Amino acid sequence: MNYNIHPVTYLNADSNTGASESTASHHGSKKSPSSDIDVDNATSPSSFTSSQSPHINAMGNSPHSSFTSQSAANSPITDAKQHLVKPTTTKPAAFAPSANQSNTTASQSYTQPAQQLPTQLHPSLNQAYNNQPSYYLHQPTYGYQQQQQQQQQHQEFNQPSQQYHDHHGYYSNNNILNQNQPAPQQNPVKPFKKTYKKIRDEDLKGPFKCLWSNCNIIFETPEILYDHLCDDHVGRKSSNNLSLTCLWENCGTTTVKRDHITSHLRVHVPLKPFHCDLCPKSFKRPQDLKKHSKTHAEDHPKKLKKAQRELMKQQQKEAKQQQKLANKRANSMNATTASDLQLNYYSGNPADGLNYDDTSRKRRYENNSQHNMYVVNSILNDFNFQQMAQAPQQPGVVGTAGSAEFTTKRMKAGTEYNIDVFNKLNHLDDHLHHHHPQQQHPQQQYGGNIYEAEKFFNSLSNSIDMQYQNMSTQYQQQHAGSTFAQQKPTQQASGQLYPSLPTIGNGSYTTSGSSHKEGLVNNHNGYLPSYPQINRSLPYSSGVAQQPPSALEFGGVSTYQKSAQSYEEDSSDSSEEDDYSTSSEDELDTLFDKLNIDDNKVEEVTIDGFNLKDVAKHREMIHAVLGYLRNQIEQQEKEKSKEQKEVDVNETKLYPTITAF
């Protein structure tokens, strides 16, 4: 509040009383610009202090006494600053207008709820204003109305959400406030927001109904529905029926191009033809898939690359394992044959050739029947049994007993396992390994010659068994003598309880290079051992010079050195472990493949020009041919027995039997 009052105004107040009255009357008719005073200045205690107060008269109308005459408790401002409690105003008897007051004054006090403020800064300068006794009666009402206006402004600014509610009671009693209150406004209508339903699994089962405007056609698949929308409803510019506004359930979407409206139609059709390669999600439009793919590229690029690398490694491992299994299955016949040969190479058991019965041969060779048949037919061709079987079919040799006798004599002469048969079987074995058959030779019916072939290969098998037994016996005798000769010096060396350590001589220090190191190790007359000793002091004598530092090194390791590895190697090892790639895995796989427990590198033993390993292979081949021939003989005998039974049955019956179809 501004309480600074110019003193000249109070000095001229008593002398110019008439002028002040004329001024008051003048302002009663027309409001001067000086009447626009602040509320704080107008409602100050000094402005409302009456000149009729006895306290002011006692002080001699002093401005200082008028400034301090009223206390702050009687001011209407303090009433406004207190809690809002609506006071109950009672009109006393003095509220009625007195006789000495004019009618204008009474009407002015009743018609104006808020009385006009004085034009001067102090009420003692305006006699008309000071002569109104009803001012203090209306003053609390004025303060209460001002307080209501302030509270209304406070509620309008601080509580905007309550301005549309209709308050009863307090505001309804104040007609002055309700006159200026605006009518409540209704909420504006928001535009309709388009929402699209998500496609569920049930939506993809159909049937699918066209909801374009008044069309009610039903389709079985969403693809046909989409084609119907594009062709019939959207149309084409060339057909003069192009429609770029979507009428699906009053969608109302309008586009500029036909491609845009056809792409928009996928939103309504439950069709998701665009699939993500990195996750199982599918999308209706290609732009949706493109937007989705960015999430994979931005969020998890490293994880995706790592997952792809791991997937590639897993696929490579599975492919390698499948390839290894296929190779093992393809070579199962050779592996089983080699294992049997390795067990029976040097056993010397005379019953080895008799342990191959028909059931074991069937079980061994049924896994790769094509290869077995090729081997058997090749062996029979080499021993001229195929030609002999075809001989009766040739017209030039039919009935010629000389050719049959010649072949029989040649067979009988070749039944012994000699060096010629050994070379022939070796040549055949090499041919089978280098030239694998592409197709199987057809089985041929040998007729009566199959018995001759079985007899020939049976005698040849017995001859090979005898040869193999004699050779294995000779090898065991030689091997036993060599092992005894090797064990004898070993036993002599083991007579000493503890082995002696080599020492280094004094005269070995003059050598240089590799001879110097050899002298350090091989000289046994010295006093220094060939192995390093940690922190051993060297002897010093006046006649012998101090030993050079090279004497302290043994293979690059010093006697004062605790570790021969540097710390850099450790760091390199850790980096190599981090950079572990598929190439290292391949190397490990190859190393593990080489760690097979087999005796492939068996030393070759040759006795009298026969290789013991080749003889074992030849024995297996002849046994295979012999087993095949025996199976053929059994089948022929079974067929003959069946035919004989049918003939016997037909001869015993007098009348033929009629069978029903």
Curated annotation (Swiss-Prot):
Q: Enumerate the GO terms in the molecular function aspect.
A: DNA binding; DNA-binding transcription activator activity; zinc ion binding
Induction info reads: By alkaline conditions.
Report the main location listed first in the record.
cytoplasm
GO biological process, alphabetically ordered:
cellular response to alkaline pH; cellular response to copper ion; cellular response to iron ion starvation; cellular response to lithium ion; cellular response to neutral pH; cellular response to pH; chlamydospore formation; filamentous growth
Q: Does the keyword Repeat apply?
A: yes
Q: Compositional bias of type Basic and acidic residues: which residue ranges?
A: 287-321
Question: Which keywords belong to this entry?
Answer: Coiled coil, Cytoplasm, Metal-binding, Nucleus, Repeat, Repressor, Zinc, Zinc-finger
Q: Where in the cell is it found?
A: Cytoplasm; Nucleus
Compositional bias ranges of the Low complexity kind? 43-54, 145-163, 173-189
The motif YPX[LI] motif 3: which residues?
655-658
Q: Which family does it belong to?
A: Belongs to the pacC/RIM101 family.
Q: Which PANTHER family match?
A: PH-RESPONSE TRANSCRIPTION FACTOR PACC/RIM101, PH-RESPONSE TRANSCRIPTION FACTOR PACC_RIM101
State the name under which the record lists this protein.
Answer: pH-response transcription factor pacC/RIM101
Q: What is the native source organism of this protein? A: Candida albicans (strain SC5314 / ATCC MYA-2876)
> The organism's lineage?
Eukaryota, Fungi, Dikarya, Ascomycota, Saccharomycotina
